[in-house]
Amino acid sequence: MQAASLAFHPPALRTSPSYLSSKLPHHLNYSLFKHAPSTSTLSLTQVLSRNTICKPPAVGKYVREDYLVKKLSAKEIQELIKGERNVPLIIDFYATWCGPCILMAQELEMLAVEYENNALIVKVDTDDEYEFARDMQVRGLPTLYFISPDSSKDAIRTEGLIPIQMMRDIIDNDL
């Protein structure tokens, strides 16, 4: 019995100029980078607008235009804590350079949509509010404070990246 040859012989490469030129114009017609003049007159705010069920806090500014979680100053946070609330307050201490903080921001946005009427979620940039972060004993990032509307309950503090389900459990069961 004779051994079969396992040698692979690739087909001849088609590198003739006529073959390439016949394929090139067709390829350019479907290019992702081809610029076509736009006939649409929609503004960016019309495209990115989102309908919200409840109003976000009147103070502070959004990290991005389409986010529900607002970035607040230390003074604004202190007013929220001292003021009357019907819903729990979740404060996220973060930094723009912190990788886990970016991941946590995505989870907090999902929570903000999910608990839109039942919780208030805000952010504090620790680089902008260094003294406030120090006073709140923020040692690692991200740090979350879960503050109940009931002043007799203690605040819950977490440090580091935590799963979204753990945040749900804290909001639903402990606040």
UniProtKB/Swiss-Prot annotation:
- What Gene Ontology terms for biological process does this UniProt record contain? cell redox homeostasis; plastid organization
Q: Which Pfam families match?
A: Thioredoxin
Tell me which residues are marked as the site Contributes to redox potential value. 99-100
Entry EC no(s): 1.8.-.-
Q: Where is this site: Deprotonates C-terminal active site Cys?
A: 92
Q: Which InterPro entries match?
A: CITRX, Thioredoxin-like_sf, Thioredoxin_domain
**Enzyme class label:** oxidoreductase
FT transit peptide: 1-64
User: Could you name the Gene Ontology cellular component terms for this entry?
Assistant: chloroplast
Covalent S-S links between cysteines: 98-101
Location relative to the cell: Plastid, Chloroplast
Where is coiled-coil annotated?
none
Changes seen on gene knockout: Yellowish coloration in the leaves.
Q: Where is the Thioredoxin domain?
A: 74-175
**A GO molecular function held by the record:** protein-disulfide reductase activity
- Record note on quaternary structure: Interacts with Cf-9 resistance protein.
Family the UniProt entry places it in: Belongs to the thioredoxin family. Plant CITRX-type subfamily.
What's this chain's function? Probable thiol-disulfide oxidoreductase that may play a role in proper chloroplast development.
What is the name of the protein in this document? Thioredoxin-like protein CITRX, chloroplastic
Gene it is expressed from: CITRX
